[in-house]
């Protein structure tokens, strides 16, 4: 009986140590991922948007992208950019 209790307590201690190690590794990966996202985000922020994207609000002074067209869609009370059934050329 004492051996069984000792084995269970020892197993719980091993699991606690292993889970602490996994948690530390997961936190390091999370920080690395966050840094990578911030680097990529800073690079994309430098690009200026010259047109409105899909479902963006549009007017004469805010044009849609080339493959979109500005349309009034009910029940939305303003014009939005919708697909004009063409594909952008790259």
Swiss-Prot record:
* InterPro entries reported for this sequence: Huwentoxin-1
Q: Mostly located where? A: secreted
**Which residues, if any, are the signal sequence?**
1-19
Q: Does the keyword Cytoplasm apply?
A: no
Q: Where in the cell is it found?
A: Secreted
Q: Which cysteines does the record link by disulfide bonds? A: 51-65, 58-70, 64-81
GO MF: ion channel inhibitor activity; toxin activity
Which tissues carry this protein?
Answer: Expressed by the venom gland.
Got a GO cellular component term for this one?
Answer: extracellular region
Prosegment location in residue numbers: 20-50
- UniProt entry keywords in alphabetical sequence: Disulfide bond, Ion channel impairing toxin, Knottin, Secreted, Signal, Toxin
What Pfam families does this protein map onto?
Toxin_12
State if Ion transport is listed as a keyword.
no
Show the domain comment.
Answer: The presence of a 'disulfide through disulfide knot' structurally defines this protein as a knottin.
Query: Hey, which family's this protein in?
Result: Belongs to the neurotoxin 10 (Hwtx-1) family. 13 (Hntx-13) subfamily.
Q: What does this protein do?
A: Ion channel inhibitor.
Q: Which protein is depicted? A: U7-theraphotoxin-Hhn1a 8
